[in-house]
Amino acid sequence: PVQLVMATPPWRLVGSGRLPATEARRKALFGDKGTFPLFASAASSLLEEDGRFVCIISPDRLQDMLAALDGAGLTPYLLQYIHKQKTSPATFVLIEARKGAHAKPSVAEPIALYGQERFFTLESLAFCPFLR
């Protein structure tokens, strides 16, 4: 068993949106209703008790992922919304779930990636120094 599993599951549903030019990109970005349960189940089988599963998805699929986590015995622990700019809708949601936990999830302060001049914000650089 491991303490941490990280993933970026394909969150777009097949048949929605514009398809990428390559098959590899299509597989990376598009899945079906069974994709999230597969990822959650695989993560759960790899994790030790109280291990963490962290993933990033589109906010419009949040309910689907929460249901998949519940079905795999993973409890959402932390949600954090990622915005392109402070005034724009969330582009992504970062989810941390724990195996066998019974805590209520908390919502962290949202992160805005870009400021007015399209440069990374200090908060986004603090969150991910690799953006420098």
Give the role of each language-model region.
Residues 32-94:
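Conserved Class I SAM-dependent methyltransferase catalytic core
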Residues 2-4, 9-38:
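Mobile active-site "lid"/loop adjacent to the S-adenosyl-L-methionine
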